[in-house]
Amino acid sequence: MQNPIGPYPGRQLFSGLTSEGNPCLVYLVTGRSPESRERKAIQMGSKVAIGPLGATAYDPLRHYTAVMNDNSTGIAAVTNGIQTEAIFETYRLLYNVKTQPTKEYLQIIMEGAAAEPDSLHTPRIGAIITSGQGEPVSFLSIKRHDRPALAFDVRMQKGKVTGIAVYNGPMETPGPFDPDSGLPELELKGTGALDIARFLFDISAAANKGQDIRVCTVGAVLKSGAWDVAIVNAH
């Protein structure tokens, strides 16, 4: 099996349910340039950050909090940039004040975050897992520079995750992911956080100019009221 987007998704996330019915998410980071590959995922309590290797200088577009989770509410957010905390705290507020969560809140935050200010106008992507009327719900979103932010409901089916990516797959000429062609789905292999992180890492093997583009994957599974988080780093 190969990544459903193609060899170069840039950064990519999926959310859904494991085969046991547990809410889960998994996040992939890849990079074509040496600077983009010189990164790793770092777990810091209930957060996972994408940080530099060694003495590499801090870059706010490459180094950021990617995942935040909370056991007391069962909420988890994952994104490719500065929008993670805003999304997480918004849905935690909705949970605490007992307001029904909808995708529109995610869409508004993503529109405000805008695309990344780089030469490729890199899209921002994000996902949230929370609960609505006692059942797990999840929403995905993408913000491209050339269109308003879009948000989508995830069909929560056992053993399946739905995803969204930054780029549309080609290695040499990456363009922004187009959700109009449909969102990719995966049938998960494994039920634990490390299982799904390793699964996405393995199916995303690809090289640019002889160099493996994979940086890391992060998997998270909500089991028995607690988030199990695992990381697979290339370095």
Task: Identify the meaning behind each predicted range.
Residues 1-235:
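Conserved short alpha-helical segments that host acidic/polar catalytic motifs at enzyme active sites
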